[in-house]
Amino acid sequence: MRKLPSGRYQAVPMELNAYQDAARSTAAYPHVGQNPIYPTLGLTGEAGEVADKVKKVLRDREGVFDPEAREAIKLELGDVLWYVAQLARELGYDLEEVASANLDKLVSRVARGRISGSGDHR
């Protein structure tokens, strides 16, 4: 992400940790650095907004994700990502560490034939 003279950001290939650092510079909530509750609540709210936009595509657009709907969902996904980045940082994790651990878990499940089903420790 590159900041333009206009103050807007331009998308460029970036590492997750670079995103997390840039996102942190915009964090303005109570007790930043020692408050995992705020980003957790924000994350659930934003995930709900994603679900609501998808629901409205089903209800109002016959399930067609046209460019307008896709753009609206993209913006909400960005908000989800922002809160994931904040929560990870509040818990002492870099986003790349979280992403790597997630892929390791999924690859292990595939290798053991346990990708389907439920439960954290399958």
Label every PLM stretch briefly.
Residues 1-122:
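Flexible "arm" and connector segments at domain edges
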